[in-house]
């Protein structure tokens, strides 16, 4: 199976949080980048250290080998 070094997660709600935490446990070195249109949700994700959070969608997906939609 292909190994992904950068994964973007679009939508940072409950499902995305579970996915990010699982990916982080599986490989702590993986680059996880998230985006949500809701600023409150983005701030919460930042606060708990879920992933690197971007405020612009194009920044979140740039260079990603895998994009997971959780909307």
What residues fall within each predicted segment?
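Rossmann-like NAD(P)-binding element
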Residues: 57-71
